[in-house]
Curated annotation (Swiss-Prot):
InterPro entries: ConA-like_dom_sf, GH32_Enzymes, Glyco_hydro_32, Glyco_hydro_32_AS, Glyco_hydro_32_C, Glyco_hydro_32_N, Glyco_hydro_beta-prop_sf, Suc6P_hydrolase
Listed GO biological process terms: sucrose metabolic process
GO molecular function: beta-fructofuranosidase activity
EC number: 3.2.1.26
Species: Zymomonas mobilis subsp. mobilis (strain ATCC 10988 / DSM 424 / LMG 404 / NCIMB 8938 / NRRL B-806 / ZM1)
Keyword terms, alphabetized: Carbohydrate metabolism, Cytoplasm, Glycosidase, Hydrolase
Protein name in the entry: Sucrose-6-phosphate hydrolase
Localization per record: Cytoplasm
The encoding gene: sacA
Active site: 43
Reactions this protein catalyses: Hydrolysis of terminal non-reducing beta-D-fructofuranoside residues in beta-D-fructofuranosides
Amino acid sequence: MESPSYKNLIKAEDAQKKAGKRLLSSEWYPGFHVTPLTGWMNDPNGLIFFKGEYHLFYQYYPFAPVWGPMHWGHAKSRDLVHWETLPVALAPGDSFDRDGCFSGCAVDNNGVLTLIYTGHIVLSNDSPDAIREVQCMATSIDGIHFQKEGIVLEKAPMPQVAHFRDPRVWKENDHWFMVVGYRTDDKKHQGIGHVALYRSENLKDWIFVKTLLGDNSQLPLGKRAFMWECPDFFSLGNRSVLMFSPQGLKASGYKNRNLFQNGYILGKWQAPQFTPETSFQELDYGHDFYAAQRFEAKDGRQILIAWFDMWENQKPSQRDGWAGCMTLPRKLDLIDNKIVMTPVREMEILRQSEKIESVVTLSDAEHPFTMDSPLQEIELIFDLEKSNAYQAGLALRCNGKGQETLLYIDRSQNRIILDRNRSGQNVKGIRSCPLPNTSKVRLHIFLDRSSIEIFVGDDQTQGLYSISSRIFPDKDSLKGRLFAIEGYAVFDSFKRWTLQDANLAAFSSDAC
């Protein structure tokens, strides 16, 4: 007898196959960011290099461009750039994941691709807290078709814990470890977030070790993050990193400007003890970056991908039947107690025509240019020592009718500003990152049809800060300009590449 989840899997697969070609006419469908063929996408899940290929799973609702009962979508790549859509990996419907296959991870267990995920069950529609969440397993030999194995971890660290999700598993010596987020009740507030640590010998029988860290500890998180979602724990350089997505932090100055955040704490790990040594630091300064997940590439690089969207933001692409995409894969490094992120070198595969201008000097003036395509890579070096303009930078995706996305250095605020108030349909707001204390600022920019990603560096280090935001300009908004306001600005180098479309709407032949 077919299980309810198997029937749901077939329905999801049919919806996905029928939708692919329709997206080719969507003016905002990305050229090189992983995006669903149809429906809704949020958290990346199960990132792994397995049997010669990179696998990316994701939270997915294939029936409409809105959040619904979560499935696991699936894509694969050999180069981190060209991704092929695979059959839907998981669908809800069994007793242990009736209302959703929530976020989780993937591990290679002796050649078996093993997914550990949260089964979500709604007990009542009267309250968002009337839920039950358990940790489940599914396995695959071919890396495409998965067999559910049921619940492997049922009990949360404390009684009456409802929110208990997003497992992340790794192997250390002869033991498997798991971190998972959970929330305890707090009568004065919405709750208190924590990360629990478990240990197992076989991935099926888990023992609670301790609460690895929580918001009732001595951490400057405002002590009011009511949930810590999507935890990850790994080594980078000579430090251990606890990465997570806290919910409930209040905005403070330039910090915590989005509904929810995504960041990390550095510390020391001596199993089973994690000793934090830094405060919480946000990973990205843009409007749209959440639920980041990290994995190890075949050459040992630590690579990160995040959901390139945010819960409260408008999603104009819903009119075309899809919503959500992933950020570019980013290489992680640790420099001076800070994680720096740079786009993976494989992105250079997409470079086509190149345009180079060696030195551009402007004095209360503009330098216009035209882009051949909305798919662009830009490298700009700004000489701070030789410039005194109040504001200097770029206007991108302009159309001569007021539509533009502004990226500029503001000397009065000592910040780098991204202004998307005129960036197209239903997007507003300004975000910024610190201006590096350096003689020259390097801006590495990727423009897709509905996004901008900026990597900020100084004269020594690339990727000190990143700003990631969705934009929705008209398809003919292909003009740009350099500008300087109230003074002069020296741009030492201005390089632009038109990028090839990576054909992300392709459906893998392995799916047949």
